[in-house]
Design a protein with these regions (language model features):
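Polyanion-binding catalytic cores of nucleic-acid enzymes and NTP/SAM-utilizing transferases
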Residues: 1-266
């Protein structure tokens, strides 16, 4: 957003000389701004089906989801809950280590805005890939009921298989895999005696764009206008691309919730 650029400039100050600032400062300013203005929605980027085996077939419940916890006056919206859900594949591990607090056999997790469930197993195809995850829910733990206060360490997001939209998600990341492209460019050209274009290609981050064609997002996002600011819960900040259509929505990642590059470079 324009406001996040202003925040970034305020953070680094105004100078009259050529200065190099860490990219993380810009990302921090963007996160700070979008945390205040982005509408929260649930989206599943790497889906696997979650089946609640003891939930009544055909039953649908309307759960309340907060639009923006930073601004309660913006109200809530409805997200449908049913027996079959999409969850993130990365939120399940069949043989999990001791401090793994997401979905794994024998362990409870909270489905955000819904119930506490206990994983009972999974199904695999002939190649050994997990195609379905199974769990059972506790009907006394619905959000807002006294039973929902039971302590559970993990919370995961989800969307209902029958009440979501298919979407394309474009994961943009840093263009360069080096922190100082200008100095690195000169060093590569000198070391390899090559032209600038060849040297630049060596610095390009191969993961600067990943397109995920088959993601799922809750129906509430269908009413969002192009360039609307969203937070995909537990994932990052996104906006609605101008290529979006009612039949196939398209979202672009602005920045993740956390500084992944900072961890990689430590």
């Amino acid at each position: 957003s324009p406001e996040s650029i202003h925040k970034f400039i305020d953070k680094i100050g105004y100078t009259t000389y050529d200065a190099l600032n860490e990219f993380a400062l810009l990302e921090s300013a963007v996160r700070e701004d979008l945390n205040d203005r982005a509408t929260r929605v649930s989206a599943v980027l790497n889906p696997v089906k979650l089946i609640i085996t003891n939930y009544p077939e055909g039953q649908v419940e309307e759960m309340e989801a907060v639009n923006n916890p930073e601004h309660p006056e913006e109200g809530n919206h409805v997200i449908e809950f049913s027996r079959e859900l999409w969850m993130e594949r990365d939120d399940f591990m069949e043989d999990a280590p001791k401090k793994y607090f997401r979905m794994t056999p024998g362990q409870e997790v909270r489905l955000k805005n819904a119930y506490i469930v206990k994983c009972t197993g999974c199904k695999k195809n002939d190649a050994g890939e997990i195609t379905e995850v199974y769990c059972e829910y506790d009907p006394d733990t619905k959000s807002g009921l006294p039973g929902a206060n039971r302590k559970v360490k993990g919370t995961i997001h989800w969307v209902s298989c029958a009440h979501c939209l298919e979407a394309e998600v474009r994961l943009y990341d840093r263009l360069w895999k080096v922190e100082n492209p200008r100095d690195e460019l000169a060093a590569i050209r000198e070391a390899k005696n090559c032209d600038a274009l060849t040297a630049m290609k060596e610095m390009i981050n191969p993961d600067s764009l990943n397109v995920l064609p088959c993601c799922y997002i809750e129906k509430y996002a269908a009413g969002m206008q192009p360039l609307s600011y969203l937070q995909f819960q537990r994932i990052g900040y996104f906006n609605v691309d101008k290529d979006s259509t009612p039949e196939k929505m398209v979202f672009n990642r602005t920045v993740g919730l956390k500084d992944v590059w900072g961890k990689i470079n430590k």
